[in-house]
Amino acid sequence: MTSMSSLFSFTSPAVKRLLGWKQGDEEEKWAEKAVDALVKKLKKKKGAMEDLEKALSSPGQPSKCVTIPRSLDGRLQVSHRKGLPHVIYCRVWRWPDLQSHHELKPLEVCEYPFGSKQKEVCINPYHYKRVESPVLPPVLVPRHSEFNPQHSLLVQFRNLSHNEPHMPLNATFPESFQQHSGGSSFPISPNSPYPPSPASSGTYPNSPASSGPSSPFQLPADTPPPAYMPPDEQMGQDGSQSMETGSSLAPQNMPRGDVQPVEYQEPSHWCSIVYYELNNRVGEAYHASSTSVLVDGFTDPSNNKNRFCLGLLSNVNRNSTIENTRRHIGKGVHLYYVGGEVYAECLSDTSIFVQSRNCNYHHGFHPTTVCKIPSGCSLKIFNNQEFAQLLAQSVNHGFEAVYELTKMCTIRMSFVKGWGAEYHRQDVTSTPCWIEVHLHGPLQWLDKVLTQMGSPLNPISSVS
């Protein structure tokens, strides 16, 4: 009791009152400092304290915006930790497990939401709602499979390898993304495996039949396979079919009784991450159970399950370039899985470079484009809903069109050093330090759909 009384001995009555609505029992001292800093700001505004207390005491009732001045970088420092103000106070008074601003959306009644970039920002926790994962509609697969459903079709193609003939183009966030918001500057290909993207105004940039650079190593059993590449002549016939963006989830002219719905299921581990140095895999795969994962260059003696610490991994083939690059990874990248979307936030002092076909599709980029994310920036790199739409449409175009989507479920990311047309490194396997993120939910969904569809028209064989 003595320690508790000393904790609040110098706490103002206003702070004590506000702490009465605090959620969770962790980080008492941090919460007290956060509330104390807020009270000092609100006392300068007439009625602000009363408005906040009313909002906290009557959660279901309408309440006013409670604002504080926006700082230069938008963040607020509380006890040596910087964070976004609306996230800090939503964590204190509503959701102690809140990880990121990506998990919050403002209500329509809020006049000063954080995202509006006004001089004032609302920190009323009841002016924000938490993003919920959307329910993905089942994919309807025609009932004409002759394949034994006890076997996974993805396993059959695990040892396939292929080369990407096109050197990846490069883009920088946010500059390149603003340029492409209205459409694509890349030439259109009749062989595009996907329908027009939301950002490309009815056109999709040039998309070769082959995938991004594949890693020149044998993939172990727990790693998703490289994508299957159909024969060139078949892509010339079947791959050139265009897809309508508004097509039904069910195959056209297909009676409902002749389709098998395949539901999306959230896996226990939403992704796995594998680390590479040049073309060598280093260490074991990291399986992410938390929706917030840090991949950094440090060592972690506490063995935190939410961190993948690359500093712990050893490699006898490591050269001086790799050693130097590893020293600059620093805080690395923060991966969030929120509301069916994956975000990558660069915490490192140097940029990270991301190759995500789903992200490229959304922005109207070439599928293999490598996007540079500068320090302090975050980018959405995968959207489950867009993937679900593509999968539902691809089912109507055969096995190969669906299998093409496996390339979308693997995201490559390099630290410090980039690759592509604007860099002297043309392939990700030429970068000193990089990771491969495999999205388990979409991959498992694809596996189930492919199993229902049966074998491809041209059976795949290792014999040429």
From Swiss-Prot:
Which GO terms of the molecular function aspect are on file?
DNA-binding transcription factor activity; DNA-binding transcription factor activity, RNA polymerase II-specific; I-SMAD binding; metal ion binding; RNA polymerase II cis-regulatory region sequence-specific DNA binding; transcription cis-regulatory region binding
Residue stretches making up the MH2 domain? 270-464
- Signal sequence bounds: none
Entry keyword annotation includes Cytoplasm: yes
Bias-annotated ranges (Low complexity): 199-216
* Transcription recorded as keyword: yes
Q: Where is the MH1 domain?
A: 13-137
Which keywords annotate this record?
Cytoplasm, Developmental protein, DNA-binding, Metal-binding, Nucleus, Transcription, Transcription regulation, Zinc
Specify residue ranges for compositional bias: Polar residues.
Answer: 173-183, 237-251
For this protein, the record's Pfam families field holds: MH1 (PF03165), MH2 (PF03166)
In this chain, the stretch annotated as Disordered covers 166-258
* GO cellular component terms attached to this protein's record: cytoplasm; heteromeric SMAD protein complex
Q: Which CDD domains match?
A: MH1_SMAD_1_5_9 (cd10490), MH2_SMAD_1_5_9 (cd10497)
Name the job this protein performs: Involved in ventralization. May mediate Bmp2b signaling during early phases of embryonic dorsal-ventral pattern formation. Required for initiation of Smad1 expression during gastrulation.
The record describes its quaternary structure and partners as: May form trimers with the co-SMAD SMAD4.
Q: What is this protein called?
A: Mothers against decapentaplegic homolog 5
User: Organism source for this protein?
Assistant: Danio rerio (Zebrafish)
The taxonomy runs:
Eukaryota, Metazoa, Chordata, Craniata, Vertebrata
